């Protein structure tokens, strides 16, 4: 414990945090430094990596999530399981929720980019999923 406290005190960058004994200038858990909003962070670093399909209706504030997912699909990126993605832009919230439900029923991981109002509007689609 004394080694870690001395590494913190001798950190020349002036930043606080736990450092490793082998490299006193670097934090133990440096993370990824970037500037983005919540839509960008979740879509780029989570949803495009773990899902098989992104189904959405472009409506503010969730439009950006669908656009980023489409860019990932267009560039041919694979998810962490090595599978290609599908990006589907629907004509309404009902269609988007129905598409995401159908995708999930077939055993695929799907994301539906929507807003609070979109969830309420497409609530009828939730009742179709059980029993299918």
Language model region names:
Residues 2-132:
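Thiamine diphosphate
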């Amino acid at each position: 414990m004394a080694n870690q406290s001395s590494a913190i005190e001798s950190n020349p960058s002036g930043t606080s945090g736990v450092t490793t004994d082998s490299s006193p200038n670097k934090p133990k858990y440096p993370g990824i430094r970037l500037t983005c909003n919540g839509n960008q962070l979740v879509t780029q670093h989570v949803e495009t990596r773990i899902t098989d399909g992104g189904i959405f209706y472009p409506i503010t504030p969730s439009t950006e999530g669908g656009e980023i997912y489409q860019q990932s699909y267009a560039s041919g990126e694979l998810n962490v399981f090595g599978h290609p993605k599908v990006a589907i832009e629907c004509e309404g919230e009902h269609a988007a929720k129905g598409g995401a439900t159908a995708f999930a029923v077939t055993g695929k991981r799907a994301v539906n980019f929507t807003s609070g109002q979109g969830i309420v509007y497409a609530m009828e689609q939730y009742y179709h999923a059980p029993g299918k």
